[in-house]
Protein backbone atom coordinates (compact mmCIF):
# COMPACT_ATOMS: atom_id res chain seq x y z
CA UNK A 1 0.00 0.00 0.00
CA UNK A 2 1.76 3.12 -1.26
CA UNK A 3 -0.90 5.83 -1.37
CA UNK A 4 -4.00 6.39 0.81
CA UNK A 5 -6.82 8.81 -0.02
CA UNK A 6 -8.89 10.42 2.75
CA UNK A 7 -11.86 12.43 1.41
CA UNK A 8 -13.12 14.62 4.26
CA UNK A 9 -15.85 17.14 5.00
CA UNK A 10 -14.25 17.88 8.40
CA UNK A 11 -17.18 16.33 10.30
CA UNK A 12 -16.74 14.26 13.47
CA UNK A 13 -16.69 10.93 11.66
CA UNK A 14 -14.40 12.27 8.96
CA UNK A 15 -12.08 13.42 11.75
CA UNK A 16 -11.93 9.80 12.92
CA UNK A 17 -11.29 8.72 9.33
CA UNK A 18 -8.43 11.23 9.11
CA UNK A 19 -6.86 9.70 12.22
CA UNK A 20 -7.34 6.18 10.88
CA UNK A 21 -5.81 7.18 7.54
CA UNK A 22 -2.74 8.54 9.30
CA UNK A 23 -2.36 5.38 11.40
CA UNK A 24 -2.67 3.19 8.30
CA UNK A 25 -0.15 5.33 6.42
CA UNK A 26 2.29 4.97 9.33
CA UNK A 27 1.92 1.18 9.36
CA UNK A 28 2.40 0.89 5.60
CA UNK A 29 4.82 3.83 5.27
CA UNK A 30 2.42 5.22 2.66
CA UNK A 31 1.87 8.65 1.22
CA UNK A 32 -1.46 10.14 2.34
CA UNK A 33 -3.75 12.54 0.48
CA UNK A 34 -6.52 14.58 2.13
CA UNK A 35 -9.26 15.66 -0.27
CA UNK A 36 -12.07 18.16 0.36
CA UNK A 37 -14.90 18.78 -2.09
CA UNK A 38 -16.84 22.06 -1.79
CA UNK A 39 -20.23 23.01 -3.16
CA UNK A 40 -20.23 26.58 -4.48
CA UNK A 41 -23.11 28.81 -5.68
CA UNK A 42 -21.42 29.33 -9.06
CA UNK A 43 -18.77 27.58 -11.15
CA UNK A 44 -15.95 28.79 -8.93
CA UNK A 45 -12.94 27.82 -11.02
CA UNK A 46 -14.12 30.14 -13.82
CA UNK A 47 -14.37 33.24 -11.63
CA UNK A 48 -11.65 35.86 -11.60
CA UNK A 49 -10.51 37.40 -8.30
CA UNK A 50 -12.74 40.44 -8.73
CA UNK A 51 -15.91 38.38 -9.19
CA UNK A 52 -14.99 36.15 -6.24
CA UNK A 53 -15.52 39.20 -4.00
CA UNK A 54 -19.23 39.03 -4.83
CA UNK A 55 -19.41 35.83 -2.74
CA UNK A 56 -17.78 36.73 0.61
CA UNK A 57 -19.29 33.77 2.48
CA UNK A 58 -17.91 31.31 -0.07
CA UNK A 59 -14.49 32.99 0.09
CA UNK A 60 -14.60 32.60 3.87
CA UNK A 61 -15.53 28.89 3.63
CA UNK A 62 -12.71 28.29 1.15
CA UNK A 63 -10.27 29.98 3.52
CA UNK A 64 -11.42 27.79 6.42
CA UNK A 65 -11.14 24.65 4.29
CA UNK A 66 -7.62 25.54 3.19
CA UNK A 67 -6.62 26.22 6.80
CA UNK A 68 -8.00 22.87 7.97
CA UNK A 69 -6.28 21.00 5.15
CA UNK A 70 -3.04 22.74 6.05
CA UNK A 71 -3.40 21.54 9.65
CA UNK A 72 -4.00 17.98 8.44
CA UNK A 73 -0.87 18.19 6.30
CA UNK A 74 1.19 19.37 9.26
CA UNK A 75 -0.25 16.62 11.48
CA UNK A 76 0.69 13.93 8.94
CA UNK A 77 4.16 15.38 8.40
CA UNK A 78 4.78 15.41 12.16
CA UNK A 79 4.24 11.65 11.98
CA UNK A 80 6.96 11.43 9.34
CA UNK A 81 4.53 10.94 6.47
CA UNK A 82 4.57 12.37 2.97
CA UNK A 83 1.28 14.23 2.57
CA UNK A 84 -0.61 16.23 -0.04
CA UNK A 85 -3.91 18.10 0.24
CA UNK A 86 -6.50 18.88 -2.42
CA UNK A 87 -9.46 21.26 -2.54
CA UNK A 88 -11.91 20.89 -5.42
CA UNK A 89 -15.27 22.43 -6.22
CA UNK A 90 -18.49 20.53 -7.03
CA UNK A 91 -18.42 17.53 -9.35
CA UNK A 92 -19.75 14.94 -6.90
CA UNK A 93 -18.56 11.36 -6.70
CA UNK A 94 -16.88 11.54 -10.11
CA UNK A 95 -14.28 13.90 -8.66
CA UNK A 96 -13.43 11.47 -5.87
CA UNK A 97 -13.09 8.49 -8.19
CA UNK A 98 -11.25 10.45 -10.88
CA UNK A 99 -8.82 11.80 -8.29
CA UNK A 100 -8.25 8.33 -6.87
CA UNK A 101 -7.61 6.86 -10.30
CA UNK A 102 -5.27 9.67 -11.33
CA UNK A 103 -3.07 9.25 -8.27
CA UNK A 104 -3.34 5.44 -8.19
CA UNK A 105 -4.50 5.26 -4.60
CA UNK A 106 -4.41 1.82 -3.00
CA UNK A 107 -7.00 2.57 -0.32
CA UNK A 108 -9.76 5.08 0.48
CA UNK A 109 -10.72 5.99 4.05
CA UNK A 110 -13.58 8.38 4.77
CA UNK A 111 -16.37 9.06 7.25
CA UNK A 112 -20.15 8.99 7.21
CA UNK A 113 -22.92 9.59 9.71
CA UNK A 114 -25.12 7.19 7.77
CA UNK A 115 -26.40 6.58 4.24
CA UNK A 116 -27.83 10.10 4.23
CA UNK A 117 -25.14 11.66 6.39
CA UNK A 118 -22.14 13.85 5.70
CA UNK A 119 -20.73 11.58 3.03
CA UNK A 120 -23.68 12.43 0.79
CA UNK A 121 -22.84 16.12 0.81
CA UNK A 122 -19.13 15.39 0.58
CA UNK A 123 -19.32 13.23 -2.51
CA UNK A 124 -22.56 14.44 -4.04
CA UNK A 125 -23.86 10.90 -4.03
CA UNK A 126 -24.73 8.01 -1.78
CA UNK A 127 -21.71 6.39 -0.17
CA UNK A 128 -22.69 2.95 -1.46
CA UNK A 129 -22.10 4.15 -5.02
CA UNK A 130 -18.54 5.10 -4.13
CA UNK A 131 -17.97 1.71 -2.54
CA UNK A 132 -19.35 -0.09 -5.60
CA UNK A 133 -17.52 1.96 -8.21
CA UNK A 134 -14.12 2.38 -6.56
CA UNK A 135 -11.34 0.15 -7.90
CA UNK A 136 -9.68 -0.06 -4.47
CA UNK A 137 -10.79 -1.04 -0.95
CA UNK A 138 -12.88 1.57 0.88
CA UNK A 139 -13.24 1.91 4.66
CA UNK A 140 -16.22 3.97 5.85
CA UNK A 141 -15.96 5.22 9.42
CA UNK A 142 -19.33 5.76 11.11
CA UNK A 143 -20.28 6.53 14.71
CA UNK A 144 -18.43 3.64 16.33
CA UNK A 145 -14.83 4.04 17.41
CA UNK A 146 -12.32 2.31 15.14
CA UNK A 147 -9.28 0.60 16.62
CA UNK A 148 -6.21 0.06 14.48
CA UNK A 149 -4.42 -2.18 13.66
CA UNK A 150 -7.57 -4.17 12.89
CA UNK A 151 -8.07 -7.30 15.01
CA UNK A 152 -10.97 -8.88 13.12
CA UNK A 153 -11.97 -8.52 9.47
CA UNK A 154 -15.27 -9.85 8.10
CA UNK A 155 -15.25 -10.83 4.41
CA UNK A 156 -18.84 -10.86 3.11
CA UNK A 157 -19.75 -12.55 -0.17
CA UNK A 158 -22.17 -15.04 -1.70
CA UNK A 159 -19.01 -16.99 -2.65
CA UNK A 160 -20.64 -17.94 -5.95
CA UNK A 161 -18.70 -15.38 -8.00
CA UNK A 162 -14.93 -15.14 -8.33
CA UNK A 163 -13.84 -12.94 -5.43
CA UNK A 164 -10.25 -14.15 -5.30
CA UNK A 165 -8.72 -10.74 -6.14
CA UNK A 166 -10.71 -8.99 -3.43
CA UNK A 167 -9.86 -11.73 -0.94
CA UNK A 168 -6.15 -11.41 -1.69
CA UNK A 169 -6.37 -7.75 -0.66
CA UNK A 170 -8.12 -8.77 2.56
CA UNK A 171 -5.40 -11.33 3.29
CA UNK A 172 -2.72 -8.70 2.71
CA UNK A 173 -4.36 -6.29 5.18
CA UNK A 174 -4.97 -9.04 7.73
CA UNK A 175 -1.36 -10.21 7.58
CA UNK A 176 -0.08 -6.65 8.04
CA UNK A 177 -2.39 -6.06 11.02
CA UNK A 178 -2.19 -9.55 12.51
CA UNK A 179 -5.99 -9.77 12.20
CA UNK A 180 -8.34 -12.76 12.07
CA UNK A 181 -10.48 -13.15 8.93
CA UNK A 182 -14.12 -14.22 9.28
CA UNK A 183 -16.07 -15.41 6.22
CA UNK A 184 -19.76 -14.48 6.06
CA UNK A 185 -22.45 -15.50 3.59
CA UNK A 186 -25.90 -14.02 4.21
CA UNK A 187 -28.88 -16.29 3.55
CA UNK A 188 -31.65 -13.96 2.35
CA UNK A 189 -35.36 -14.79 2.43
CA UNK A 190 -35.21 -15.56 -1.31
CA UNK A 191 -32.44 -18.17 -0.99
CA UNK A 192 -34.43 -20.88 0.81
CA UNK A 193 -31.16 -22.56 1.79
CA UNK A 194 -30.63 -24.68 4.86
CA UNK A 195 -27.70 -23.64 7.04
CA UNK A 196 -25.64 -26.55 5.74
CA UNK A 197 -26.44 -25.79 2.11
CA UNK A 198 -25.71 -22.12 2.70
CA UNK A 199 -22.27 -23.03 4.06
CA UNK A 200 -21.33 -25.14 1.02
CA UNK A 201 -20.02 -22.22 -1.11
CA UNK A 202 -17.86 -21.06 1.82
CA UNK A 203 -16.41 -24.54 2.30
CA UNK A 204 -15.59 -24.78 -1.40
CA UNK A 205 -14.04 -21.31 -1.30
Label every model-predicted segment.
Residues 1, 104-106, 136, 150:
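Local beta-strand N-terminus motif with an aromatic residue
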Residues 53-67:
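A short acidic, glycine-rich active-site loop
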Residues 107-129:
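Glycine-rich, Arg-bearing micro-motifs that act as flexible, cationic patches
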Residues 109-112, 137-143:
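Short beta-strand elements of ligand-binding domains
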Residues 37, 113-114, 143-145, 186-187:
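Short, ordered loop/turn segments at secondary-structure junctions
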Residues 13, 67, 71-108:
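Structural beta-alpha unit
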Residues 1-52, 152-205:
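Small/aliphatic-rich secondary-structure junction motif
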